[in-house]
Amino acid sequence: MSEEVSKRVEEEADTPGLEGQSDDSSDEGDASGDTEMDFLRSLFSRTLGLSPGDKVLDELTLDSVARYILSGKCKNIICMVGAGISTSAGIPDFRSPGTGLYANLQKYNLPYPEAIFQIDYFKKHPEPFFALARELYPGQFKPTVYHYFIKMLKDKGLLRRCYSQNIDTLERVAGLEGEDLIEAHGTFHTSHCVSFLCRKEYSMDWMKNQIFSEEIPKCDSCGSLVKPDIVFFGESLPSRFFTSMKADFPQCDLLIIMGTSLQVQPFASLVSRVSNRCPRLLINMEKTGQSEFGMGLFSFGGGMDFDSDKAYRDVAHLSTCDDGCMTLAELLGWKKELEEMVKREHALIDSKDAKKTDKEASQSSKSAVAEAEKTDKTE
């Protein structure tokens, strides 16, 4: 402890109100302990410059968050998103009982559900992962309302960054660029040979062709497995996650958390990296992130606090992600614009898919004709 902090501890220990605590009863002893802990938290918060300061939100409601966004004081929004933002696109989340991904993997005969995303298991038994990838491959789904809401934040100059746990690339399909995104758990956008001596890179189209031809992707240079650049259990997160985190979160003036259970570290602990004045909005089916992430004394309110008497910046809006986004858009006066964006972009995707289907059908027809002509000549 520094000399300055030690001095302040001694000075504030003499503060009236901390003297004369009685030990006559266990209740009074507990109260004394709570008071001393509150005192220490307060002291370290002030000493390290982490005290809440003035409230930014006038009330802990979605309406207040909307007013804050419209005030002009909110210019660096960070979005933290998980699988819940993609469920309305038809992509299952991981943990929902009965419908989540982990609850529906019995057909792959795994030793346990998480094995399908463990790097050691994948290297020995890649078949279950690639079978699942055929079912969930990016490009089979359309972005949701929330994906386009993030794009709208970018278009309005309000988005600092989107930190995503998802590997479905729907943020990119919705119009976000690589610089707008931190894909914390990786992406299907690129793939690499798993051999440390090779590491040859492959495109998304190459991987897609391999997966839908029902072949196990192998490197054409060394013969090793090729794996999409998603982060498996047992692998490190992308280095950009850590470098961007240090630059982004101190600048954040509104954190929007959506569709994540906040159970997977280190992603979950990002909520504690914004300043203590920064409002945090959770849009989810249930409240989450309320633990202190094991930070003990130095957890200066790092966990979400929606309901206590000391709550001052955390807002929970319990709904589906799409409904919550549309409600917020309406409060911001952006609802019609968002609805039109979703309709327009989905129509473009349908048009591209139709052209692609026609092209594939034409190529298939030409191949069939060529094969028939070849057969006729042979006969």
Swiss-Prot record:
PROSITE patterns linked to this entry: SIRTUIN
Pfam families to which the protein is assigned, alphabetical: SIR2
Enzyme superclass (EC): transferase
Active site as annotated: H185 (proton acceptor)
Keywords from the UniProt entry: Cytoplasm, Metal-binding, NAD, Nucleus, Transferase, Zinc
Example GO BP: positive regulation of proteasomal ubiquitin-dependent protein catabolic process
Residue intervals of the Deacetylase sirtuin-type domain: 55-335
Reactions it catalyzes: N(6)-acetyl-L-lysyl-[protein] + NAD(+) + H2O = 2''-O-acetyl-ADP-D-ribose + nicotinamide + L-lysyl-[protein]; N(6)-tetradecanoyl-L-lysyl-[protein] + NAD(+) + H2O = 2''-O-tetradecanoyl-ADP-D-ribose + nicotinamide + L-lysyl-[protein]; N(6)-hexadecanoyl-L-lysyl-[protein] + NAD(+) + H2O = 2''-O-hexadecanoyl-ADP-D-ribose + nicotinamide + L-lysyl-[protein]
Enzyme Commission number(s) of this protein: 2.3.1.286, 2.3.1.-
One GO CC annotation: perinuclear region of cytoplasm
Note on how the cofactor is bound: Binds 1 zinc ion per subunit.
Similarity remark: Belongs to the sirtuin family. Class I subfamily.
Name of the protein: NAD-dependent protein deacetylase sirtuin-2
Organism: Danio rerio
Lineage of the species this protein comes from: Eukaryota, Metazoa, Chordata, Craniata, Vertebrata
